[in-house]
Design a protein with these regions (language model features):
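Signature of extracytoplasmic/envelope-associated structural regions
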Residues: 1-142
Length: 142
């Protein structure tokens, strides 16, 4: 069976309010975990547990290089803390969505906290932002 090698080059757009910012060039790692809450639907007479899908679950972890300024990583993340209205638009490679490059739109995510200063002598300052909650849609239409 043939395999495909995938070189990641994710696009990461963060929208808060009416402002969308492309932070792809400020990140070096991104993980999206999607799912649904399992709701037990076991009934009398069943011989094992049964489940049905409940509310969607979303967890996103992004590692950013810290930068400071009016429209930079620190200011953008600070504006997202605690609001629960952030929209993340992420695709694995490039901006054109296709079956081989699905775009995930994560709506009403919350950034509960982040570390605005994370400095070590001789190293690039990075921060991991963890967004949770909201809903997700997978888009493959160009």
């Amino acid at each position: 069976m043939a395999t495909t090698t995938f070189l990641s080059n994710a696009t990461i757009n963060i929208t808060q309010g009416a402002t969308t910012t492309d932070l792809s060039d400020q990140a070096n790692a991104c993980t999206i975990t999607i799912g649904v809450d399992p709701l037990e639907s076991t009934a009398f007479g069943d011989t094992g547990h049964r489940f049905t899908g409940g509310l969607q679950t979303v967890d996103v972890a992004i590692t950013f290089f810290l930068s400071y300024g009016a429209a930079e990583v620190e200011a953008i993340l600070a504006s997202c803390v605690g609001l629960g209205t952030t929209i993340l638009t992420i695709s694995p490679s490039g901006t054109s969505e296709t079956a081989t490059n699905p775009e995930y739109v994560l709506t009403n995510c919350m950034l509960a906290n982040f570390t605005p200063i994370n400095s070590t002598v001789g190293e690039l300052a990075t921060v991991e932002a963890s967004f949770t909650g909201g809903t997700w849609v997978r888009d493959v239409t160009p």
